[in-house]
Amino acid sequence: MVSSQRPVPNKIQKQQYLSISPSNSVLKDDVELEFSDVFGPLPEEANDIAYDEPAVVYSRSHSLVGPCSLDSHSLKLTKLTLLETEDSIDLVECLEGESLKENDDFSGNDDSDNEKALEGDLVKVSGVVGIDDFEVMKVVGKGAFGKVYQVRKKETSEIYAMKVMRKDHIMEKNHAEYMKAERDILTKIDHPFIVQLKYSFQTKYRLYLVLDFINGGHLFFQLYHQGLFREDLARVYTAEIVSAVSHLHEKGIMHRDLKPENILMDTDGHVMLTDFGLAKEFEENTRSNSMCGTTEYMAPEIVRGKGHDKAADWWSVGILLYEMLTGKPPFLGSKGKIQQKIVKDKIKLPQFLSNEAHAILKGLLQKEPERRLGSGLSGAEEIKQHKWFKGINWKKLEAREVMPSFKPEVSGRQCIANFDKCWTDMSVLDSPASSPSSDPKANPFTNFTYVRPPPSFLHQSTTTL
């Protein structure tokens, strides 16, 4: 869990925050803003509620408020590689001449191979990408089950993000199905505003997801520094988010954890949706009964535990839009109070917003899901045709031809300036991991390995000669 020691804006910084607001009237009663007033409560422990799936209730992360500057950024690196060992320090200095072997899914039928894998020997599988193919550079994030690293693929020098998750922690939390679903869902997605999975594999102790490295920072990070977004900028960001969520729904996937921390920005300023740890595949006219998400962005039907469908994502999009336009979510307080407000309280819309912004927020933030914008037969088209999006050319937008007016400072593919120094200064050495069950049949992560096909296979066209 992220430490609760957060940099709190002082009075001068608060005044700077207020000065960029389009109207002083909306904030005149909030001159002495506290950090939690702007971004919601500090992290709390998730409570466990009995549902048909393990309850996963996140609190907001406040880890992206203090990046290193571009001027002081240094790319002086120690050559490191990834190593899986019985002692389970999986990131160690690479010793010259040392040979590493790769352990792919130990789910084969050969008992001798399974025994070797369980004894700590790593079995090399020809043509499959594994830990020995990557050189670690920096820590760029941390989650419930492990860390996220900036890595370089040795063969091509391409830069990626590698999400490393400890199996023992996953099993302790009973989250194996979530992790498998994340991997499976990522293999089915191909969209200009969604981070792509490039490779996945596993070793005895850990799971590995290798994804696009997006280094423009988080939407949350830019929102913190700008205070709030102008409507024209928020419109482009929201349109890109709507496009991404619409693609997921067309694929039969709910994201279920849409929030600024899960929306990255690329070097051109486009949004990139990430983190599918709570995503779920669904069938039309069916509901999920799990209690999951991040409290501030949960739809009322999730809080009530009455079952939810893809309409819950559109509520979260509405909360995101509200936060972009006003600087903070509509409901603040302790986790319990926020949940009560989500179910009972009306949302107050600031007067400085346009009538069109009021209309789309009211549509997305309907407490009854069947009345919510995007829940009708036309789905996302209902949102895309809303008058607030008048002027958005959706074909050009999805071709990445509509450029946001803000472009983050990025000095190159390796730049980590938009990541918090609390991560990038962190040691790349990981903590020990307990050994999983010695029974190969108990491994729930079979068929985890994946290599994304080249674009020519994903978008293959036939040519007549």
UniProtKB/Swiss-Prot annotation:
Give its localization.
Answer: Cytoplasm; Nucleus
Name positions with the PTM Phosphothreonine: T449
Look at the named UniProt entry and state the broad enzyme category this protein falls under. Answer: transferase
Cross-referenced SMART domains:
S_TK_X, S_TKc
Ranges for region Activation loop? 275-301
Provide a GO biological process annotation.
Answer: negative regulation of cell population proliferation
Keyword tags: ATP-binding, Cytoplasm, Kinase, Nucleotide-binding, Nucleus, Phosphoprotein, Serine/threonine-protein kinase, Transferase
* EC number(s) reported in the record: 2.7.11.1
Which InterPro entries does this entry report, sorted A to Z? AGC-kinase_C, Kinase-like_dom_sf, Pkinase_C, Prot_kinase_dom, Protein_kinase_ATP_BS, Ser/Thr_kinase_AS, STKc_AGC
Q: Does the keyword Magnesium apply?
A: no
Q: Enumerate the spans annotated as AGC-kinase C-terminal domain.
A: 390-460
Q: PTM Phosphoserine: at which residues?
A: S290
Q: Where is the Protein kinase domain?
A: 134-389
Q: What is the effect of changing C94R?
A: Binding to RBR1 substantially diminished
- Active site at D257
Q: How is it modified after translation?
A: Undergoes serine-specific autophosphorylation. Phosphorylated at Thr-449 by TOR.
Residues bound to ATP are V140, G141, K142, G143, A144, F145, G146, K147, V148, K163
Q: Can you state the subunit structure given in the record?
A: Interacts with RAPTOR1. Interacts with RBR1-E2FB complex through its LVxCxE motif. Interacts with TAP46. Binds to MRF1.
| Family listed | Belongs to the protein kinase superfamily. AGC Ser/Thr protein kinase family. S6 kinase subfamily.
Q: What is this protein called?
A: Serine/threonine-protein kinase AtPK1/AtPK6
* Species name: Arabidopsis thaliana (Mouse-ear cress)
Q: What is the lineage of its organism?
A: Eukaryota, Viridiplantae, Streptophyta, Embryophyta, Tracheophyta
